[in-house]
Each structure stands twice: as structure tokens, then as C-alpha cells.
Amino acid sequence: MDPCDCSKSGTCNCGGSCTCTNCSCTTCKKSCCPCCPSGCTKCASGCVCKGKTCDTSCCQ
């Protein structure tokens, strides 16, 4: 279950550089922000997005 309710209005700021709309949270699962695409194996469930690309710096 995704802890981020993306149906809420507002802005979701994941980490220092990832921003997605229609969220109201500060930490997101990979499905919430584009920097953590669903196919990114480096981003575990409940990750905090740190970047916009799927690499070692994407999530902490």
C-alpha cells in the first residue's frame, strides 16, 4: 500500500530535489515520484526520493 495519497492536492517534496504534484507527503514509495520509477530495483518500498534518475543516488 502506497503511504502517499497522491489524490490529495498539494505538492510532494521527496528528498532534496524530487518534486511531484497531487501529493501531500514528504516521503514516498517509488510509485509516487518520477525519480523512483516502478522498474527501479534500487528504490525499495518506502524509499525517500533524492534525485530524478534511476541510479544509486535516486533513493536513500
Swiss-Prot record:
Residues 1-28 are annotated as: Beta. Belongs to the metallothionein superfamily. Type 1 family. A divalent metal cation 2 binds at C6, C12, C14, C25. A divalent metal cation 6 binds at C36, C40, C43, C59. GO terms for molecular function: metal ion binding. A divalent metal cation 5 binds at C33, C35, C36, C49. Class I metallothioneins contain 2 metal-binding domains: four divalent ions are chelated within cluster A of the alpha domain and are coordinated via cysteinyl thiolate bridges to 11 cysteine ligands. Cluster B, the corresponding region within the beta domain, can ligate three divalent ions to 9 cysteines. Keywords: Metal-binding, Metal-thiolate cluster. A divalent metal cation 3 binds at C14, C18, C23, C28. Signal peptide: none annotated. Residues 29-60 are annotated as: Alpha. The keyword Ribonucleoprotein does not apply. A divalent metal cation 4 binds at C32, C33, C43, C47. A divalent metal cation 1 binds at C4, C6, C20, C23. The keyword Metal-binding applies. PROSITE patterns: METALLOTHIONEIN_VRT. InterPro entries: Metalthion_dom_sf, Metalthion_dom_sf_vert, Metalthion_vert, Metalthion_vert_metal_BS. The lineage of its organism: Eukaryota, Metazoa, Chordata, Craniata, Vertebrata. It comes from Dicentrarchus labrax. A divalent metal cation 7 binds at C49, C54, C58, C59. It comes from the Eukaryota. Metallothioneins have a high content of cysteine residues that bind various heavy metals. It holds the Pfam family Metallothio. Gene3D superfamilies: Metallothionein Isoform II. This is Metallothionein B.
